[in-house]
Amino acid sequence: MTLLEAISARHSVRKYLDKEIPADIIAALQDKIMECNKIGHLNIQLVQNETKAFTGMLSYGSFSGVKNYLVMVGKKAKDLDERVGYYGEQIVLLAQTLGLNTCWVGLSYRKVPEAYNVGKDEKLVCMIALGYGETQGVPHKIKTVE
């Protein structure tokens, strides 16, 4: 799948299958995360096999089966949200090309501090659910350029 195909195919997915992500795909994601962290001055982390963040009353948004996710962390700065969005979307599109599904999550998660690291001068901006979706998601209406 090309990058343009990934852009067209990618839709948010909230329900995931109980299917392990193969080691080669994890390695490709970790390589991209390292690259984005270095260039973007971020601390993005891939959390695997952790189910607490998307369960319980705080899991607004009908998430199910989420056990892998990205935590989007960086040093507090005026442009942190912009960098998280820019580099996060690069990882999301790579995941799509590798056959995975994703969903950006701003508020619908429970913090699980033992699963990842957020330094004193850092902020957890959001999370991105990651895995094999029950479906490929559905496209939403978008406004035309005109």
Where are these regions (language model features)?
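Acidic, surface-exposed loops and disordered segments
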Residues: 1-146
